Swiss-Prot record:
Alphabetical list of SUPFAM superfamilies matching this protein: BolA-like
Disulfide bonds: none
Domain of life: Bacteria
Example of a GO biological process term: DNA-templated transcription
Protein name, per record: DNA-binding transcriptional regulator BolA
Species, as recorded: Vibrio cholerae serotype O1 (strain ATCC 39315 / El Tor Inaba N16961)
InterPro entries registered for this protein in UniProt: BolA (IPR002634), BolA-like_sf (IPR036065), BolA/IbaG_stress_morph_reg (IPR050961)
Family to which this protein belongs: Belongs to the BolA/IbaG family.
GO MF annotations in UniProt: DNA binding
One Pfam family named in its UniProt record: BolA
Residue segments, region Disordered: 84-106
Biological function: Transcriptional regulator that plays an important role in general stress response.
């Protein structure tokens, strides 16, 4: 499973205090059982002193093979331990997909 690979790679690379990988493919217009849309939350001191774009680059580099071959969309939420505590240990919810056949009528 792609989700297992993502979890292992992020865990190995960042030794996170907290790691959550959610397959959000069911929120999108893809076949049932797909593994194409993911949300990752990574809490690691490795992000200390880095701007969000630099943190996201590190995650993207870690998952380069999966992004090139399997993952269509990746929502990335990265925090230091202190930032995570300030967020009340919750990452933002992802919006429902409005792409494909799920577009709302206007």
């Amino acid at each position: 499973m792609i989700q297992d690979v993502i979890e292992k790679k992020l865990s190995d690379e960042f030794q996170p205090e907290f790691l959550k990988v959610i397959n959000e493919s069911d929120m999108h217009n893809v076949p049932r059982g797909s593994e194409s849309h993911f949300k990752v939350t990574v809490v690691s001191e490795r992000f200390a002193g880095l701007r969000p774009v630099a943190r996201h680059r590190l995650v993207n580099q870690t998952l380069a093979d999966e992004l090139a071959n399997h993952i269509h969309a990746l929502a990335i939420h990265t925090y230091t331990t202190q930032e995570w505590q300030q967020m009340n240990q919750e990452s933002p919810e992802s919006p429902m997909c409005l792409g494909g056949s799920r577009k709302s009528a206007q």
